Amino acid sequence: MKFLSLQHIAIEDPGTFKDFLLDDGHSLTTIQLDEGENIPSNLDEFDAMLCMGGPMDTHMEQEYPWLVSEKKAIGEYVLNLEKPFLGFCLGCQLLGEVLGGQVVKSNPSEIGVLDIHSQEDIKIDPVFNFLPHTYKALQWHSYEVAGLENNKNVSVLGSSPTTKYQIFGYKKFAYGIQFHLEIRSTTVDDWAVVPEYKNALEQSLGSEALPEMKNAVNAEISTMQEQCKMLYQNFLKILSD
């Protein structure tokens, strides 16, 4: 299978999801948008599109003009080609906009290892049906998707007290995930050096929050990585259908 990954900062790649697909012999084409790389014109040659997180926000089209072409590419891939898509964090928000929603400020920001609650529709979802009723996930976001209620093809699969659309699916082939299942053991340290992420962490949890977050992630990382493996395996199945 041929995967396309749209990335917004080099250290935020598909993580363990990437490790699983490469170990299985699939190909991965990475487009580093923040470094000026262009999205391929023939998107239909790819079996799936991944869209990762980043320190920018969806409304920052003036500062990051490539966001405009990225949104168009996601729309082409999901709405016109109807091919499998998986968006994490910023990628989730970009999908939400493409599907007619808005991206709004979270109140409060969600940063840390926090609970996600599965919703009823997850039981019949082919990709996320493995998740338990409540589980822990790494969150690091100040914006979230809203306003998808009028899209009859969107299902809410996971929520938190702050964020309704923690996981949502579109027609059971395109998915947004606001949190991070794809993390490696080095992820928190890697992200903590990004100024925007560091500032958000300290504003939410205090200047000494990093060691506590690392401990919380370490306590859950084996479960998170096993869940990411199941996500990868289920996502691969819909590519084969």
Task: Report residues per predicted region.
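Acyltransferase
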Residues: 183-241
